Curated annotation (Swiss-Prot):
The gene is RHO. Belongs to the G-protein coupled receptor 1 family. Opsin subfamily. The modification N6-(retinylidene)lysine is found at K288. Disulfide bonds join C92-C169. Photoreceptor required for image-forming vision at low light intensity. Can use both retinal and 3-dehydroretinal as visual pigment. Light-induced isomerization of 11-cis to all-trans retinal triggers a conformational change that activates signaling via G-proteins. Signaling via GNAQ probably mediates the activation of phospholipase C. The chain crosses the membrane at residues 19-43, 56-78, 93-115, 135-155, 183-204, 246-267, 279-300. InterPro entries: GPCR_opsins, GPCR_Rhodpsn, GPCR_Rhodpsn_7TM, Opsin, Opsin_lateye, Retinal_BS. This is Rhodopsin. Gene3D superfamilies: Rhodopsin 7-helix transmembrane proteins (1.20.1070.10). It comes from Lacunicambarus ludovicianus. One of its GO terms (biological process) is phototransduction.
C-alpha cells in the first residue's frame, strides 16, 4: 500500500465487470502471443534455409515478446481474478522491470530489423551485408542497453509502482521531483521518439528506392518493346505497393501499440486530474497486443 500514490485514493473502485473482461482479454492475448512467438522461434531455428543473420533479429524479437508474456501473463491473470495486486511489493518491482526490459528489447530489435532492410534495399551492393557476428552484436547491444535503462529505477532514478488499476505495475509518472521526471523524459525519447523517427526515416527511403527501381524496370521494358519485365500476376501487386503497405502497417501498429502508454505517462506528469484508474488499463492492453501481431508482421514480411 505504501507504493500506491495518493492520487489514486480519490477514485472509487473500478466497476467489477472490468476485471473479468480484462481477464478474458489477457487470456486470449497470452495464448495467442505465446503460441505465435513460440512457433516463430521454432520454425526459424529448425529450418536451415531460414537461419540467416537477418532472421536472427526476427527470432530475438519473437523471444523478447515471448518472455514478456511468459513472465507477465500469470501475474496479470491472478491480479484480475482478485481485483487487486496481491503479489507483494518486491514482485511488483520485478514484474514492472521485466515488462519494461522485454518491451524495450522488442522495440529496439524492430529498429534494427528496419535498419537492416534499409541497408539491403537502399544501399544495395554498396551496403555491408549483415553477418551472423554483426547480428549477434546488435542483439547483445539491444539487451545490454535495455537492461541498463530498466534497472535504473532500482537505484533511485524513478521507481516501479502499482498502476492505478492495481492489476499491474510500471514506472512512477506521478512523482513531481525532477529526478523521477528526468528518467521519464529520457526514457520516452529512448524507447519511443527515437525508434519511431528511425523507423519512419528508413521506410521513407526504402519506399523511394523501390519506387525508383520499379520505374527503371518499366523504362527498360519500354526500350525492349514489351509491356513489362514482370509476369502478369506479379504486376498486379507491384513491389512498391507491397512495401508501402508493410511500411504503413509497421508504423501504424507501432503508433497504436506504444502511444497510449506514453500518453498515460505524460498525462500523469502534466495533467493528472484527467487520469483515472480505468484509463491506465489501456496502456498495457495495447502494449501487450503488440506482442501478438509482431510475429505476423515481421516473420511474414
Amino acid at each position: 500500500l505504501h507504493m500506491i500514490h495518493l492520487h489514486w485514493y480519490q477514485y472509487p473502485p473500478m466497476n467489477p465487470m472490468m476485471y473479468p473482461l480484462l481477464l478474458v482479454f489477457m487470456l486470449i492475448t497470452g495464448i495467442l502471443c505465446l503460441a505465435g512467438n513460440f512457433v516463430t522461434i521454432w520454425v526459424f531455428m529448425n529450418t536451415k534455409s531460414l537461419r540467416t543473420p537477418a532472421n536472427l533479429l526476427v527470432v530475438n524479437l519473437a523471444m523478447s515478446d515471448f518472455l514478456m508474456m511468459f513472465t507477465m501473463f500469470p501475474p496479470m491473470m491472478i491480479t484480475c481474478y482478485y481485483h487487486t495486486w496481491t503479489l507483494g511489493a518486491t514482485f511488483c518491482e520485478v514484474y514492472a522491470f521485466l515488462g519494461n526490459l522485454c518491451g524495450c528489447a522488442s522495440i529496439w530489435t524492430m529498429v534494427f530489423i528496419t535498419f537492416d532492410r534499409y541497408n539491403v534495399i537502399v544501399k544495395g551492393v554498396a551496403g555491408e551485408p549483415l553477418s551472423t557476428k554483426k547480428a549477434s552484436l546488435w542483439i547483445l547491444t539491444v539487451w545490454v542497453l535495455s537492461f541498463t535503462w530498466c534497472v535504473a529505477p532500482f537505484f533511485g532514478w524513478n521507481r516501479y509502482v502499482p498502476e492505478g488499476n492495481l492489476t499491474g505495475c510500471g514506472t512512477d509518472y506521478l512523482s513531481e521531483d525532477i529526478l523521477s521526471r528526468s528518467y521519464l523524459y529520457i526514457y520516452s525519447t529512448w524507447v519511443y521518439f527515437l525508434p519511431l523517427a528511425i523507423t519512419i526515416y528508413c521506410y521513407v527511403f526504402i519506399i523511394k528506392a523501390v519506387a525508383a527501381h520499379e520505374k527503371g524496370m518499366r523504362d527498360q521494358a519500354k526500350k525492349m518493346g514489351i509491356k513489362s519485365l514482370r509476369n502478369e500476376e506479379a504486376q498486379k501487386t507491384s513491389a512498391e505497393c507491397r512495401l508501402a503497405k508493410i511500411a504503413m502497417t509497421t508504423v501504424a501498429l507501432w503508433f497504436i501499440a506504444w502511444t497510449p502508454y506514453l500518453l498515460i505517462n505524460w498525462v500523469g506528469m502534466f495533467a493528472r486530474s484527467y487520469l483515472s484508474p480505468v484509463y491506465t488499463i489501456w496502456g498495457y492492453v495495447f502494449a501487450k497486443a503488440n506482442a501478438v501481431y509482431n510475429p505476423i508482421v515481421y516473420a511474414i514480411s
